[in-house]
């Protein structure tokens, strides 16, 4: 904004398929809901905060149990397991494969594509082993709190992961 640092910057979440709520603080529409951006209750933005403080706050959201970021939700909540399974699957399906297959990578983030490819190649064997370990898992997960449904099929995801690697290698 023109009056930065007296007003917080506007932050938009871009790894978004429009259907999956990847984190309670990261909305399907791209809204980032945290107090220091004045988009949630709590400690508000002050001019002594920086882009670095925003990035640190956002990093703190990226944890192994993101539903616990939602007030009143715990690992014992009714949607906890369904949400975990949905996010685990969609992080590989959408956030990795679809982005690398260039189905959904926003134009303004194309500059990060080489870094994404390198990370994928360096971690491909681990990803493939993980997906193969779940190859018999086929389910439909309903997450009531977000009216979210995810069709999970790790066997299909294994094929997509292989396709992604083939695509990346063909670009060399």
Specify the residue positions occupied by each region the protein language model found.
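Compact alpha/beta protein-protein interaction domains typified by the UBC
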Residues: 1-78, 98-101, 114-125, 129-131, ...
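Charge-rich (especially acidic), low-complexity segments
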Residues: 68-172
């Amino acid at each position: 904004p023109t009056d930065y640092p007296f007003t917080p910057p506007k932050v938009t979440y871009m790894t978004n398929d429009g259907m999956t709520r990847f984190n309670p603080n990261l909305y399907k529409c791209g809204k980032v809901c945290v107090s220091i951006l004045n988009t949630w209750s709590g400690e508000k933005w002050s001019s002594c905060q920086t882009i670095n403080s925003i990035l640190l706050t956002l990093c703190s959201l990226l944890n192994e149990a993101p539903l616990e970021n939602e007030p009143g939700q715990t690992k014992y909540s009714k949607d906890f397991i369904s949400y975990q399974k949905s996010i685990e699957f969609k992080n590989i399906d959408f956030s990795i494969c679809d982005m690398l297959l260039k189905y959904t990578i926003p134009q303004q983030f194309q500059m990060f594509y080489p870094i994404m490819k390198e990370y994928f190649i360096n971690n491909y064997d681990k990803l493939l082993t993980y997906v193969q370990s779940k190859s018999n898992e086929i389910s439909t997960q309903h997450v009531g709190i977000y009216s979210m449904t995810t069709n999970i099929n790790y066997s299909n995801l294994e094929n997509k992961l292989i396709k992604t690697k083939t695509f990346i290698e063909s670009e060399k």
